[in-house]
Design a protein with these regions (language model features):
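Short, hydrophobic/aromatic-rich segments at coil-to-beta transitions
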Residues: 87-95, 119-123, 151-156
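Structured extracytoplasmic
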Residues: 1-93, 97-105, 161-269
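Surface-exposed extracellular loop regions of Gram-negative outer-membrane beta-barrel proteins
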Residues: 114, 118-123, 269-274
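Short, solvent-exposed aromatic-acidic interface loops
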Residues: 124-129, 158-166
Length: 274
């Protein structure tokens, strides 16, 4: 059952000289549970930067060997399974499997542009047998596109994790799914960064509309329309909080993870003092 869904629309600015990396949040909305501190302990890691060009990828505090690593052959077996034509460009479909799960590794396939050897897309998952705390399954989707400036740029990134409080594969009562999807649109190069953006030292700033709480039309902000599944989630997340069974399950999970039980006036749990 869905318990929370959130959306953020933001403008990203990046420059090498001068070195600038800024995010300007235009709008944000959250539907579902109000106190998401318990979920944040797990889902916060879904915001990790997944760059397969790096030799190792930090996922949930664990370094996974990238399939595009310089030393990839030490960790993976590669198979050229197909050669296709994607948007008029020859593309190699390469499947890879881990040689061993003694170290954190992935499993899946990548599509490589034959002319530039750039990553066009990837569908990878945590290899079966890899042990990461709280994670039962992990899947990553990456799509890149060729821009007008002949540069490959991220188009879509999605990470989905199956979190669990037990190690049993069959456990459903103490498990939940978390998913994060990012879509990049309206990419521009060689465009001057506004002076007000350069003048702030904060990596993340709020736009004037976000600060004022101005009501926004999300349909105009989204680069794509919500799927039917996402629309259904929005309708369900608010109503489900009134279901007694849901309240009881959330209270139990919050107590197990947080170590204490909140009442109206006090929190009941272990006592400690410094």
């Amino acid at each position: 059952l869905p318990v929370m869904i959130s959306e953020t629309a933001a403008d990203y600015y990046h420059s090498r000289t001068p070195a600038v990396a800024r995010e300007v949040s235009r709008a944000s909305q959250i539907s579902g549970i109000e106190d998401n501190s318990m979920l944040a302990q797990f889902t916060g890691h879904l915001h990790a930067d997944v760059n397969l060009y790096e030799n190792f990828i930090d996922l949930f505090g664990v370094k996974f060997a990238s399939p595009l690593s310089n030393s990839g052959r030490s960790f993976y077996k590669y198979f050229l399974v197909d050669s296709t034509n994607a948007e008029g460009r020859k593309t190699y479909k390469i499947r890879f499997h881990p040689k061993s799960v003694a170290t954190p590794v992935l499993d899946g396939e990548v599509n490589i542009d034959s002319a530039s050897y750039a990553l066009r897309s990837a569908r990878v998952k945590m290899a079966k047998g890899v042990n990461v705390n709280w994670i039962r399954h992990l899947a990553i989707e990456i799509d890149n596109r060729l821009t007008a400036d002949s540069l490959w740029f991220p188009q879509r990134e999605k990470m989905t994790a199956d979190f669990t409080l037990t190690k049993s594969e069959s456990s459903k009562m103490l498990a939940f799914l978390g998913s994060r999807e990012v879509t990049y649109s309206d990419v521009k190069f060689d465009t001057p960064i506004p002076k007000q953006i350069l003048g702030t030292s904060a990596n993340v700033v709020l736009s004037d509309d976000a600060i004022s709480g101005k009501r926004v039309e999300w349909d105009s902000l989204r680069p794509y329309a919500l799927s039917q599944k996402e629309k259904t989630i929005y309708r369900m997340v608010d109503s489900i909080q009134q279901v007694p069974l849901y309240k009881n399950i959330y209270t139990v999970l919050n107590t197990i993870i947080g170590g204490y039980y909140n009442t109206k006036y006090v929190g009941i749990g272990p006592h400690s003092k410094a």
